[in-house]
UniProtKB/Swiss-Prot annotation:
Pathway: Porphyrin-containing compound metabolism; protoporphyrin-IX biosynthesis; 5-aminolevulinate from L-glutamyl-tRNA(Glu): step 2/2. GO terms for biological process: protoporphyrinogen IX biosynthetic process. This is Glutamate-1-semialdehyde 2,1-aminomutase. GO terms for cellular component: cytoplasm. It is an enzyme of class 5 (isomerase). Belongs to the class-III pyridoxal-phosphate-dependent aminotransferase family. HemL subfamily. Its cofactor is pyridoxal 5'-phosphate. Homodimer. It comes from Clostridium novyi (strain NT). SUPFAM superfamilies: PLP-dependent transferases. The modification N6-(pyridoxal phosphate)lysine is found at K270. Its EC number is 5.4.3.8.
Length: 433
């Protein structure tokens, strides 16, 4: 095994902490939960990413999900220079925004209209406002471990970095802001039933990740998601599927296509921007017509629907639309990783569980079942930290936190998969020493 040097990354991090909180612009990038300093990236191509010290890694972060076709895909870049030369932002409408909206609504039968924003956080925040305006109710129901961005109302018992850093509800979020946020255990039908029996007529919306990708990977059970669909209809609440991660990743029609369940509203991000900042929320026409300027619910954004993000997103979605076998390839790769990891775990006698749903995958250092926040939060995070370091030494970059998903791209090769399984075996073997 070749020893990797990180001299330049260490120097850059030392400089970064002088000017940026924690040296990073998003907490998980600091590598703090795995006890290391971050590597700084120079470039990326295909399935590989290269740090400033010249080290090469097989990348399973993939910018946390947007890069389903891999890094620096040439097809995505076709025409981007011309788009750039025409102008980066206008503040008035463009044709590409209409094309992009039409493409999304065609992929999702539950979405009649869609509004572009700049991030997944904006998408979920705006969707809640619209749902409240539409129903004229205030309360919302979310689930422990589901992360819906960092807006105040949703930063309660969240997943992602809030588990990693042990801050389930962030300081700086006033109690008054979250007094109307109800929280239930994920995959727990009886708990949801009790809340609706007590407060159902006050609940504006239920927001859920159909497959949670921010407490590792925890799939919503079919019967659980169907129950949410049924009970929200009964009480005339809005069912919001947060598909920022799952949208256009599990299938071209996302989780709703896979489960066969249609939400009232859907939030998008990541893949619809192909690596550029973007988000969107959409839903039934009668709900979306509440949004300004058609209706009274205000939401706006200077850079929403900007030409560069729309160009990349439109290209990305069209490639996926015309090449839906991408999803079969992604699932096959994920399945091979799952089988390889499980074989290694069994052979070495490691207490770990691999959870896979379609092409979403996570290795938990805990024994299953893992169906909710309480079960997932018992993972051995110290063991994961050691595992991360051993994989990094072997040139495999995975999430620097136990509670994040492993992301595959169409650029990952058979050789990448085989090498990763081999590296996994060696890393797990080191943990036993």
């Amino acid at each position: 095994m070749k020893e990797l040097k990180h001299t330049k990354s260490e120097a850059m991090f030392k400089e970064a902490v002088k000017y940026i909180p924690g040296g990073v612009n998003s907490p998980v990038r600091a590598f703090g939960s795995v006890g290391l300093n971050p590597i700084f990236i120079d470039r990326a191509k295909g399935s590989k990413i290269y740090d400033v010290d010249g080290n090469e890694y097989i990348d399973y972060i993939c910018s946390w999900g947007p890069l389903i076709l891999g890094h620096s895909n040439e097809k995505l870049y076709e025409g981007i220079e011309e788009t750039l030369r025409r102008g980066t932002s206008y503040g008035v409408p463009t044709e590409i925004e209409v094309k992009m909206a039409k493409l999304i609504t065609e992929a999702y039968p539950s979405v009649d209209m869609v509004r572009m924003v700049n991030s997944g956080t904006e998408a979920t925040m705006s969707a809640l406002r619209v749902a409240r305006g539409y129903t004229r109710r205030n309360k919302i129901l979310k689930f422990e471990g589901c992360y819906h961005g960092h807006s105040d109302a949703l930063l309660v018992k969240s997943g992602s970095g809030t588990i990693t850093f042990g801050v389930p509800t962030s300081p700086g979020v006033p109690e008054g802001t979250v007094k109307d946020t109800l929280v239930c255990r994920y995959n727990d039908i009886e708990a949801v039933k009790r809340i609706f029996q007590e407060q159902g007529n006050e609940i504006a919306a239920v927001i859920v990740e159909p497959v949670s990708g921010n407490m590792g990977v925890v799939p919503g059970k079919q019967e659980f998601l169907q129950f949410l669909r049924d009970i929200t209809k009964e009480y005339k609440s809005v069912l919001i599927f947060d598909e920022v991660i799952t949208g256009f990743r599990l299938a071209y029609g996302g989780a709703q296509e896979v489960y066969g369940i249609e939400a009232d509203m859907t939030c998008f991000g990541k893949i619809i921007g192909a690596g550029l900042p973007v988000g969107a929320y959409g839903g039934k026409r009668e709900i979306m017509e509440c949004v300004s300027p058609m209706g009274p619910v205000y939401q706006a954004g200077t850079l929403s629907g900007n030409p560069l993000a729309m160009h990349m997103g439109y290209k990305n979605l069209n490639i996926l639309k015309e090449n839906k076998d991408v999803y079969e390839r992604l699932e096959e790769k994920a399945k091979r990783l799952e089988e390889g990891f499980n074989k290694n775990i069994k052979e070495l006698g490691i207490k770990a569980t691999v959870v896979r749903f379609k092409a979403m995958l996570c290795l938990f250092f805990a024994e299953g079942p893992l169906n909710n926040y309480d079960e997932v939060s018992k993972c051995d995070t110290e063991m994961y930290a050691k595992y991360f370091g051993e994989m990094l030494k072997r040139g495999v970059l995975i999430a620097p936190a136990q509670f994040e998903a492993l992301f595959l791209s169409d650029a990952h090769t058979d050789e990448d998969i085989e090498y990763t399984i081999k590296a996994n075996y060696e890393a797990l073997k080191e943990l036993k020493c």
